[in-house]
Each structure stands twice: as C-alpha cells, then as structure tokens.
Amino acid sequence: MRRFLLNVILVLAIVLFLRYVHYSLEPEPSNQPDTYSNFSSLAENESPADYDISYNEKKGSKVLIMSPHGGRIEGGVSELVRYFNNEYSTYLFEGLKSHDNQTLHITSTNFDEPLAKKKIKEHQYVVAFHGYKGENKNTLVGGTDRKRAKMIVRALERRGFSAELASSKSGLAGLNAENINNQGETGLSIQLEISREQREAFFDDFYYKNRKYTKNSEFYAYVSAIKGVLEKEYS
C-alpha cells in the first residue's frame, strides 16, 4: 500500500512538473500591453526565423479559417486551424521562438500583416481561433455573426463541451470593426476563444513539437462540431 501511494505521489509530481514546463515555455497572453502595435514594427525588430506566415488557398472557399496567434503564441490553435485545410482556405501567423513568444502577440484590432489583410478581404466569412488563460475547460464564442456563433455554442454543448456566447461587453467578444476577423467581404465573423485547459485536453502531449502527432478523440469531437455548423451555414 505504501509503495502504491508513493507511486501515485511520484506520478502526480511528474504531471505537475510537466505542466509547469509547458506553461513556462508557452505562457498565455498577459494583460500587459503588446510589445508591438502593428506588424511593421514587429518585422523591423524580430528575426524572420522567429515566426512563420502561411496561407492555404482552397478554391471556391467562402470561409477563411485563421489565427494571428498560432504556433507558440497561443498553444494549440495552429492545429485547430490546420484541421480545416482540406475544406477551407486557412491563414496562420505563428510564433517559433524557443521562449518569449508573447513578444510576437499583436492584438486582433492591431493585427495588420499584409497577407492576412489581403486574403481576408477575398473571403465572405472569417472564423478565428484564439486562446485565453482560463483554468477550466471552456470556449467563449464571439464574432459579429452572432446567429452562427450561437449555433457553434449549441453544437459544442451537444458534444459535451463547455461553451458560451461571449458577452458583447467582453473584450473577447470580437465585435470591434478594427478586428482583423471583421474585415472580410461581409464583415461577418466567428471568434472562438478557447481556454488553456481545454486546448491542453485536445492533445496527449501538449509540447509544441508533439501536438500535431498527439491529437486525441476530444480534439476530433471538437472540430467535428464546428465543421458541422460551417458546412450547413456557409456552403
């Protein structure tokens, strides 16, 4: 019995240590002001090797699935975006630094990377994935397309996920006209703010190099719920 308890304590210690490492390497965005107020300032001061900009064109796609905070900026959102590569156009700005990727965080109302601006204007609808610090599994669904945002909430809840419509008064609602999400042809967007706890649960190993290989059933249930709404509403 004593050995069993020691083993349990050891396992818990390892889990807590790994969790600490994950958070220290990829801390969530803080309430501190961004280092850069726009992309040109970032590009002038950061090495091109420290970030990546990618765009996947899907001919005939009305929807652009994107995140300006991919890679190691808000862990787990890149994998969510890339899941949709075969059905929709996708865009990612990703942090690749070994540490301090929060310096690459540009808030969505200031994010003006040229390729993102160009491609968003070529699509009718935008679906953006983001991360926030929440310690409980939850998704705040915002954006200007409130009708479809509510549908996303219901679809996630039917799959057993905690989700809610972001309050219009919340800073995470994604309603500002300056938000990069809202600059498409129709101005209609869906913005998903996903808690850290929920994003970690999508992978058996949250370490950034291993995430794409360790997506689990919770990941696929989540994206399937979203995909169902997009196929019905934006086809």
From Swiss-Prot:
It holds the Pfam family Gamma_PGA_hydro. One of its GO terms (cellular component) is plasma membrane. It comes from the Bacteria. The keyword Transmembrane helix applies. InterPro entries: Gamma_PGA_hydro, Gamma_PGA_hydro_sf. It is a single-pass membrane protein. It is found in: Cell membrane. Gene3D superfamilies: Poly-gamma-glutamate hydrolase, zinc-binding motif. Its main location: membrane. The chain crosses the membrane at residues 5-24. Keywords: Cell membrane, Membrane, Transmembrane, Transmembrane helix. Induction: Induced by mitomycin C (MMC) and UV, and this requires RecA. Also induced by hydrogen prexoxide. Belongs to the UPF0714 family. This is UPF0714 protein YmaC. The gene is ymaC.
